[in-house]
Regions:
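Acidic, Ser/Pro/Thr-rich low-complexity regulatory regions
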Residues: 1-114
Length: 114
């Protein structure tokens, strides 16, 4: 895995700013609350799940295409932990729309981090 570059760090900061404007910092506590059930969560009904799926898939797409360092992302975010909370909702959306590409990059990044 290539060493992260200054460009990777700059992009990471931009993504962090985008995450702030999306409301990622409000979504995360909801996803990790004791009363949140990943198995019953629905991306269509839960804004926190939707935000984190979009955020995670965007970051994962950048890493997949070598536009952002996977090493840097895994040092920054607990991708597999986030996926464990929103992944079941993503899989339901895949099945509902019969579209295997939905959130595939996020899932792959989470799997590669373990």
């Amino acid at each position: 895995m290539a060493k992260p570059t200054v460009s990777d760090a700059q992009l990471m900061i931009q993504i962090a700013q985008w995450g702030t404007s999306l409301g990622v910092e409000e979504a995360m506590p909801q996803l990790f609350a004791d009363d949140f059930d990943p198995d019953t969560a629905n991306a269509m009904d839960n804004p926190a799940v939707r935000k984190m799926l979009m955020f995670g898939e965007s970051i994962a797409t950048l890493t997949k295409n070598d536009l952002l360092s996977k090493k840097l992302v895994n040092d920054w975010l607990w991708i597999e932990g986030i996926w464990s909370r929103v992944g079941p909702a993503a899989l339901k959306q895949r099945a509902r729309f019969n579209e295997p590409r939905l959130y595939e990059n996020f899932e792959a990044l989470a799997a590669s981090a373990t």
